[in-house]
Amino acid sequence: AKMASDQGLIGFSCTNSEAIMVPTYARQAMLGSNPIAWTVPADPVDFFFDCSTTVVTRGKLEMYNKMGKATPDGWAVNKDGVPSTDAAEVLGNISRHEGGGILPLGGATEVLGGHKGYGNGMIAELFSSILSQGGTSNKCMVGGKSNICHGFMAINPEFFGDPAEIKKHFSQFLQELREAPKAQGQDRIYTHGEKEHESVAKVKAEGIPVLN
């Protein structure tokens, strides 16, 4: 996606992955973390939104498992579709295809919008495995072989108007977001991509930190 915005285009990319997401009201993992990324040219930094469509990724569960800690509530369910904070149990069930998995972004039910994370996961599936007629998340790892699919798109803003004016209009709105009234105790409102831009600049200036 960033390759597109570097050329003044709106970029989109997504991928499916081995099934870890339990659809809303299901108890079997059927979708991957299925991340989606959008990038849009803007000043002073490009808008860069990149997220999984699950509450967390598999790596977060693996980290909690290594530390021997219970995961926060609302991350996963066991093979019966019951909430679980046991990372080892959930990871084992996913690996053995015994049921359970990680919840969609928004959680287990429709109350806090779990169906929306599920739907966004389906959008990633559509633009990766369905349009390419490849392996869907529940079938992309067969016999130890990967058949993961990807989707990419670049949109030329010239189709809609003057690219410079569109960029200026979007940049102005992003600045208005940054300057919106802040919640109590907060001193800054970020737009997507700012933290990453600042992190990259810091690493270039100071080097990559190494933990002992």
Question: What is each residue range found by the language model?
Answer:
Residues 1-31:
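Long, hydrophobic, well-ordered secondary-structure blocks that form the structural core
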Residues 6-10, 16, 43, 54, ...:
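Generic secondary-structure signature for well-ordered alpha-helical cores
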Residues 12-15, 39-41, 49-52, 154, ...:
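Short beta-strand segments
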Residues 21-95:
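Phosphate/diphosphate-binding glycine-rich loops and adjacent basic-rich segments that engage nucleotide
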Residues 33, 100, 115-122, 164-172:
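Conserved active-site and cofactor/substrate-binding residues in soluble primary-metabolism enzymes
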Residues 126, 131, 139-212:
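Catalytic-core signal marking the mid-to-C-terminal active-site face
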